[in-house]
Regions:
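Ubiquitin-like/PB1-type beta-grasp interaction modules and other compact soluble beta-rich domains
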Residues: 1-90
């Protein structure tokens, strides 16, 4: 399935500044695997050593937080859009 991934500004250093990239995948995990194959080091920026999403990273599939779906096993449909959103804290 071909889908669009919206890359946040802090991670664009991996994509040579590209704001969006197209990937082929059937799950969110495959999206991250494919991004890491094309852009080495990408996965380590969004996942911890165990392969889980880092606490401060949110991934949305067509506006739905994948943590409330099937997490990284969430299936993706052709034409879907994934947005990777790093949390911002302040105080």
């Amino acid at each position: 399935m071909s889908l669009k991934v919206v890359i946040p500004t802090p991670l664009r250093k991996f994509t040579s500044g590209a704001e969006t990239v197209e990937v082929e995948a059937s799950t969110v995990k495959e999206v991250l695997d494919n991004l890491d194959s094309r852009y080495p080091g990408f996965r380590a920026s969004v996942c911890d050593e165990s392969g889980s999403l880092r606490r401060f990273i949110n991934i949305y599939l067509d506006g739905e937080d994948v943590r409330f779906l099937e997490n990284l096993a969430t299936p993706v449909a052709d034409g879907a859009e994934i947005a990777i959103v790093p949390a911002i804290s302040g105080g």
